């Protein structure tokens, strides 16, 4: 086709996401099967080697409507091995576990980890790693790879570094892996840096990713502090101790370690700002102008 000539397409993969956060006009199994069948036929007519790449966010987002019989009808209407599925949000829900491994269709296990490019210390990293290891063992021969589906780049690197390395290093002891990461980041063996990273791994990076951030990143408003989007499951005092341990390192010459210092420090200060803002709101509501003036 003219489009193929212009773009010189060689991979034969076509990303198509019908019903993504959109209701189907008809929820009958026959209608859903007809939709997926016609989608595949349309790309096959243009490219006989076409493969359809489909994210499965809709099965999670509209899980009450996307029942197992409906999912099965939608998937099985496409010829075998012509529909590749992205198990989109495995850090929260693994769809393969509830669909008989996507009824035999090839799929990719994906770690989302970030919504909207928000920069915050979040991600149930250890739990997600265990889920991935289980998938690699029990996910079936149609599990074809590991991927990430983050909604923004230049976000927290650590979760992706840990998760994606499991493609090469399955069943590596987590404690040893974290120590190696700490040594690599700082450029030497530093017990304080190792301790800091173990606390980050075991106690800080434990929250299932959602649209989280720190208050300075949100539009300012009195008595509105985006509590649902700034809440943490750890104590900021604990994170401050992690930052202190990182600052005990003998060297900060490596960029990776400087990024660690910035990442943790930014989160500590961002979390603390929430406390300051709540106190500010209290003073304004009470018209305590002397207290406000005293705080500068």
What are these regions (language model features)?
Residues 1-197, 206, 223-240, 285-294:
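Catalytic-core regions of glycoside hydrolase
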Residues 209, 213-222:
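Long, charge-rich alpha-helical interaction segments
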Residues 200:
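Extended, positively charged loop/linker patches that create polyanion-binding surfaces
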């Amino acid at each position: 086709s003219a489009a193929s000539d212009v773009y010189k397409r060689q991979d034969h993969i076509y990303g198509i996401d019908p019903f993504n956060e959109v209701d189907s006009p008809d929820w009958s199994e026959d209608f859903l099967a007809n939709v997926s069948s016609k989608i595949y036929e349309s790309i096959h007519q243009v490219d006989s080697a076409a493969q359809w790449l489909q994210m499965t966010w809709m099965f999670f987002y509209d899980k009450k409507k996307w029942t197992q019989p409906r999912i099965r009808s939608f998937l099985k209407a496409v010829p075998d091995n012509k529909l590749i599925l992205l198990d989109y949000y495995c850090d929260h829900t693994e769809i393969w576990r509830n669909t008989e491994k996507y009824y035999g269709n090839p799929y990719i296990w994906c770690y989302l980890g970030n919504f909207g490019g928000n920069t915050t210390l979040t991600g149930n990293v250890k739990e997600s790693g265990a889920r991935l290891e289980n998938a690699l063992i029990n996910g079936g021969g149609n599990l074809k790879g590991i991927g990430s589906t983050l909604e923004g780049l230049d976000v927290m690197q650590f979760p992706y570094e840990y998760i994606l390395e499991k493609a090469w290093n399955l069943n590596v002891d987590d404690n040893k892996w974290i120590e190696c990461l700490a040594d690599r980041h700082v450029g030497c063996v530093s017990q304080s840096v190792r301790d800091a990273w173990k606390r980050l791994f075991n106690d800080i990076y434990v929250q299932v990713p959602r649209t989280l951030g720190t208050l300075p990143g949100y539009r300012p408003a009195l008595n509105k502090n985006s509590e649902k989007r700034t809440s943490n499951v750890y104590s900021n005092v604990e994170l401050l101790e992690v930052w202190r341990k990182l600052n005990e390192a003998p060297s900060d010459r490596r960029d990776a370690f400087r990024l660690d210092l910035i990442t943790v420090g930014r989160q500590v200060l961002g979390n603390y700002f929430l406390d300051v803002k709540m106190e500010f709101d209290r003073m304004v509501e009470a018209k305590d102008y002397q207290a406000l003036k005293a705080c500068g």
